[in-house]
Amino acid sequence: ALPPLLLHSIFSGSVDALEHWINVRPNNAVTVLDTHDGIGVIDIGSDQLDRSLKGLVPDPDVDRLVETIHANTQGESREATGAAASNLDLYQVNSTYYSALACNDQHYLATRAVQFFLPGIPQVYYVGAMAGANDMELLKRTNVGRDINRHYYTAEEVEENLKRPVVQALNALCAFRNTLPAFDGTFSYQRD
């Protein structure tokens, strides 16, 4: 639930659903924002078989979240999601996390900071580690929606990306998270 909840908070300015999830989530988890698949919006909405079982975010807000991702990616995620891209999984939006945030470095690093500072073990997918944008060339070659988020980096591309300020800041955040003893302690927070 964390990936779409953070997007919802960034896009809407509301942290209510995120705060609720923080209060009920497990402490012994691997935290992720991106994987080889898309962004699982089903995790925060109503039960698909019984709409009376409400989710963390009201369904109209989930719909707005999906449309905001489509707008932020200039329609790339729409091209890669659902039947349009040989993808029958309609409960996720196929996009890199960075592209879902309109390639906004500040928003990307803010969401990563929340991920890293929550209890658990943060995992960063290799495309996320490069703050990678949607791979439309690969999508066009394969017509597999999830391939938008599966760029094959050459050694040269890795070297170039490691010089980008957003990737350097992400690596610094990783080092901070992994070396500070406070992250081995007990978690608490207070909402202002």
Which ranges hold each PLM region?
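Active-site and adjacent substrate-binding regions of carbohydrate-active enzymes
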Residues: 1-192
